[in-house]
């Protein structure tokens, strides 16, 4: 629907809400505004329309429209651009509220809640409507603003009190208007104007901002032309508001949607019509049509309700009307402004006392009891809305009587807490309408609407219902369509669950995962049976089976609503033999439910549980039965760690046994420690000091009263002496006896035992003592043979010998290994079985001669004799052989009276179908879970029971193997480096939640090098082997572990191999397996090589998290585009000198950016072109000869985790990229597999030469900048700005990703100091910088780059726009820059041309900086300004801050909490409105930086919106805001804090006023003692004003008490290193350093970390601890205690003391006023002489600084021939050497550290050799290219 430019408001008359929305969606914003203006103009004409009291101005309309237009989601808003009228007793900001009394009028400071909700939904408020004064009346004639007539007759009343609202809707001026309804005012006008009148359940609409009539009864009501519009507004306004409305209440969840088809409707027996004859006809017809809907219409005596109605005006509820305006009446308002009838009614309240009030309330409660009984069997009441259609004259003649009669059927509704809906009943023969009211119990609003729709279909068939005055038009069927409450079947699927998904049962989480909504508990029809299927995992499964009715029962189930888009995800979690089908409910409805395959019901072990009536009852029976079982042990100690300890604890918890964990120092925070009921430290690091120390373990058991010790696997699990020691200590060892372990532990004796048990043996020998004997035996056995240590294990002490020439060497080696590792030099020989398989049988023995085999496992896939992947049942194994294996194992166990779990291992010769005894593991195996998966047993539980002599009856136990299970072992090891262990901190961990994963690791786990590298066992269960392989593959694809290198890629490679698919496995197959990793390997790291992505980490600048990303985004994006990647794909940034990289897979690369010699396998390759790389090739990127950075794009990208939405590396924060750091020698980076690679977008392509960036060969650059945010004349003198652009700036040596420092002319300041912001004219209150801002830190400019700080207190003269920032990424120290001014428009044009050119690869689209783009002169950065209105609405200055930022600055240069709150209001408004184009709002002390998307909103458009928003912000000084009070421990002047100061003194500046001690400096300049500084720190409460004051959520906070705001200064120059957690004071501000970072605050102590990088703490949803308006307090702790707290924080177990609170500004001001004398005295003491002395001190210090720069002179020196000269790749300060003269070092080893600005950079040795010279000492300045060391290369 569109309109032409000359269309008037007449075309919109009678439009519904949807008509208005359709118009706006199909029209331009100009057309939309014109139509709204036309509507407004049409109402601003003579004669005055009595329906309106006030209309908005054109300016107000434009303001509302501007705000609406700014909203990103405006077209989805339910009231998008819909004009709405509001009754004039409801507050609308911008219009007076009169309540129809001119002398009562006031200007509301904010909207009422309902108006706020309507505006939020997109509505445009056009005016306020007339009413009976103070909403007292049902006639619409009691107003000094005139009488509002009925829309159909000027002689008849419109009804009151909401007369005006009904009139403007009936005439179609607006589709919706708000009324209020205390006693019928929302219904009577609806009846008299042919409208819908919705009077909601009392309290579900907020009455905040509504002038009360009777506050306890008032409701806001809705007038609408159709049901759909009424329901739409109901849904919008139905929001609880308990903070502002005492009677507010939330709507019920899952409310009644519709009444039944035979709903019982009661009508009055006797209806007084007061002589009216026409309305009874309408009512009778309406009732008849209600009956036709199928309703059961009955007559009842309404007397209890009518009695209740009489209370309203005959009782003390009149007093409520008086209370509402008492203060107004006491002010003696002009009598002519008061309606005499209204005032006489209200003043009638004076006759009632407080006693009367209680009397009438008691009376009401008594009547309500009658009402409840009356309505017990009634669903709905139907009454005439009003009996009369009075004329104006009739009302004038009998004003009270007529009004009273009109309220006959309305007055009782709110008193009885009922919902009501007034609907039309048609027209009388005189053309006047009337209606009926449907009344339901509270919260039946939706059902009443649906009933009305049914009624309309009967009384107005075939769409014949008219609306309002539009009697020639009918309501479109769509406009009476209803949505109903939020549960919508069209977007969800009903699902019945019957088993473990029920509430409180183990799989209920799966429903929660898919956002299912509980609907009800019900039963099936009587046609079902319920079965418990055999348990083959930890969860019991049900089987619901439909049968003949005669054999079936009703089964209890729960019904849920599952969103359609997540239903597939839910189905994927359903294991076989279950599936999803349909079930018939007892109501006859068929819905989705679980079904079971026939095999499930027939499987052995299936139990018919129908008699229990439901799964829950059966489950409870099992629990009860379980609890009655024999108590096993009270306490069991787990003598192990890692995943097996975690797994054992689960079973102990299930059995109700108290668990005890033991732990080493590195395992202090491990999962088994936190999972156990009790944890005991073993005090040590190595295995020998802890888990292998028998005495410590047994002492821990005694200490905790453990009756048993279960050892798991490894460590002491097969130590016979430990088993004996436990027994001697009176503690049960959960395992076999020491004698059995000893006998089976030595391989030669194990062979003898096996032989005795009749178990086949591999041909072999007894123990051999000499080489000669070994040679003889080997010859007899025939080569190849295995030489084995009798005590070996874990792959140690066994080696294959192929020929006699090797036997001597290997014999001695194995003998030595046995003696070294196991204390036993015994060796024997066995024949080697070629292509043997490793098959083992899981054995359980009861200790009394009975043993049972629980199945076999194939564990043939091994690397370095360690198992990798196991499966059960063993594939390709004849059934006869399988049974023989099990029988042999049982025979061995019975012979030994074996007790508990053991594994009998066999070598299986598949070719000959023969098996031989290998050994017995006298413990639980790592791979035991796969046996559990196919048998449904809990092997640990069996072990515990057997150890307690409560073994199952093996004779009657029938073990059934169901399906196939596989396990893959996830190790922290590097498969590319011969499976070298790979310890590290895990930064991200994800496992599939549908598979079984036995693990001990999670995000934040530190993998120690001390122990086994096992991270997890990933276990799946399938119906057959193919299914299991498929599931294991899926599980491995979904497994993500970052922070250390794992074997996940290796595992995926194996299970997708052809040999694994065919089960062609053997113990040696992996030895020859050609693993082809999808990875690259760093063999030389380069100077500063990191992973970045574009656009980086967006949206966290306000927190102090920089975007990072590429310094040269243009070249970076080209690299990805050339190889065909999506622009967001991570790639590699190279700085100064590039890396060498080995590619272990084929791929395509491109190198862009600066020029360097690039070679592939020694052959030079071109840049800016796609290059194919073969597997095994080595790429080398040399030193950059032009530019500073190059970029390596790899097709498909690099597999690294996202951090805060980005792959980019931020090294200072140690986040993102590869483990949060630059790449190092030996790093292995995996590339995404093809299955998961979503980064590839198109084929690789060459790019035209014209797209290659023009990197300066002359070291001279021209860079465009936008002016501002700070300029002339307020900050800089005009000539200083001119000089900035006319002079050339040299790039300082101290430049990097944190910032590019410049050397050039000293600025000429327009002011002498920064006022409250600081002593230097460059200082200002902390605000958030723009990325690319040229920031004057004192007199020295620094360009803020992608890793730079966000919040700071220095002015910025210009900003490098986004399109020009790539040049900043390419400048090198010593280069010169000429800045030129650009307009916003030119900057955007350059940026947009780059985007188009890169996307299209069309060089003609690219615009470069040229004379046309450049402004002739600099421009003012001030874009707009709003003058001060009052103290709470200060001056606002909008400053240009680049091409994507606007800085909004409030008030004068002073810190003011009211300004901070105003900024918060603006941020909240933007967030609420989802304002188009705004990316982020970053709060400073008195400003907010707004980042915007130039593609969505222009700078000018944004300014209009921001100016409009300012007028929306209204508050007084009594504001409140949510505020956490955060209490932190702090160690005063701890050693680490003092070390930072010392390091600064040694390396940066040897003398300064704040040296050698910062606390002394603060005390001296403030004339106080050190103790007073100490007292201030621990007594002050600091208010957080902004975040990111030196990165990562570091707060900029100010003491609430002005007496705690000391004089002070920051370091100059700043520190390059500050300890994480350091607390600093800088003048009035306090900061906590969130990371090891640069800084300038005076350091006073240290607290716990405030940046939870991995969100490990239970309360951490985000990494940052604080938000603006939080309050911080410190309490003293020792340094030792703080270190422990810090360690706890780093491991997520420290709980920060946080108190949820509200900051009450009014209370704060009261406190300030109460202490004003001492505050004033303190502030005056800081002025005058002290301030002058302080300023002079700092001035002198700065002067001294300029004279103290030290650069070590060059020295001429000859070095030996062949010496390797090491040059610095960086400019900076020499911090320290990490190797010494005389050391022999390897290539790549670190030599020394250069510190520059915000980073430490290691210079490594280019070659191996001996260091003969280190050329600098600590603190020396070093330039890029300087010689820093000399190495003598060794032959």
UniProtKB/Swiss-Prot annotation:
How is this protein annotated for GO cellular component? cytoplasm
Molecular function terms in GO for this entry?
Answer: allophanate hydrolase activity; ATP binding; metal ion binding; urea carboxylase activity
Record's note on what induces expression? By allophanate or its non-metabolized analog oxalurate. Repressed in the presence of readily used nitrogen sources.
Alphabetically ordered keywords of this record: ATP-binding, Biotin, Hydrolase, Ligase, Multifunctional enzyme, Nucleotide-binding, Phosphoprotein
Report the pathway entry.
Nitrogen metabolism; urea degradation; CO(2) and NH(3) from urea (allophanate route): step 1/2; Nitrogen metabolism; urea degradation; CO(2) and NH(3) from urea (allophanate route): step 2/2
Summarize the subunit comment: Monomer.
NCBIfam families, per this entry?
allophanate_hyd, PRK08186.1, urea_amlyse_rel, urea_carbox
**Additional remark text:** Present with 952 molecules/cell in log phase SD medium.
Q: What is this protein called?
A: Urea amidolyase
Query: Which gene is this protein's source?
Result: DUR1,2
